[in-house]
Amino acid sequence: MNVQWYPGHMTKAKRQMQEDIKLIDLIIELVDARVPLSSRNPDIDELGKNKSRLILLNKSDLADERQNEAWKTYFQAKGFYVVKVDSRNGSGMKAINNVIQEACKEKIERDRRRGIKNRPIRAMVVGIPNVGKSTFINTFAGRACAKIGNKPGVTKGKQWIRLNKGVELLDTPGILWPKFEDQQVGIRLACVGSIKDDILNMEELALWLIDYLRENYKGILAERYQITEEGTSVEVLEAIARARGCLKKQEELDYAKASLILFDDFRSGKMGRITLEWAPL
């Protein structure tokens, strides 16, 4: 299964970020806790050289808690500051401001030596489409100050948000990178909704997810749909279609509808807490 999505506006957005990076002290990078490595744009490391770095494991309430901790340890070992958050319900948000101060302590000390007081920390908020940047900013700022959407590609243009916490945030559009060298990355991103569904083969993607869940979260499909997980992935999708009454005319099974139900249940956490890539040991 080949997955690629890099619309033209992302090239423009990347160029703008290259200019804006000169203005900031800290990069706050949101990643999807269900796919922490796959949801990191490799271009950010190049853009963010010599900048303090904070990774937010967002949507952590949807991800396997053991893997949340494993990924936190992994990124900390790479030199990042890391906080587990869920920007929708505010979980983990209280810790962020203290971590920002810690990440920028050298900048704060530099300002102090120069006699500069209370200059706000300027942070750029980055992440791939649909990772939850706008929701994070709204929750962190405590007011509706950035556009919100549940589809990739909603936030456009440049937005600075001044916070009372002595921090200025620069929101940026969600951008991917031109080519996924590893197709598994594209597939994982498609599963969590960071690539538009309407350019994907959702039935083929559903078969991938079924195979992954049977291997790594055995029994979770059986419990959710009251079906057997035995047989091929196609047979399991058929069982889900029957269990949820996904039928066309003449009693033909509606695989497309069953696939959408599967992804709605996965993405919303109705199946339970699931991580699609595990931290390296």
Describe the residue ranges of each PLM region.
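Helix-rich effector regions associated with P-loop NTPase G domains
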Residues: 1-27, 33-43, 47-53, 60, ...
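Short, solvent-exposed amphipathic alpha-helical segments in soluble enzyme
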Residues: 44-46, 72, 141
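Canonical P-loop GTPase G-domain recognition
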Residues: 61-126, 145
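Conserved active-site beta-strand-loop modules that form the wall/rim of enzyme catalytic pockets
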Residues: 87, 137, 167-170
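Alpha-helical scaffold segments in soluble metabolic enzymes
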Residues: 95, 99, 135, 208, ...
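Short, structured loop/turn "capping" segments at alpha-beta junctions
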Residues: 107-111, 144-150, 216-220
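Glycine-rich phosphate-binding P-loop
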Residues: 122-142, 147, 172
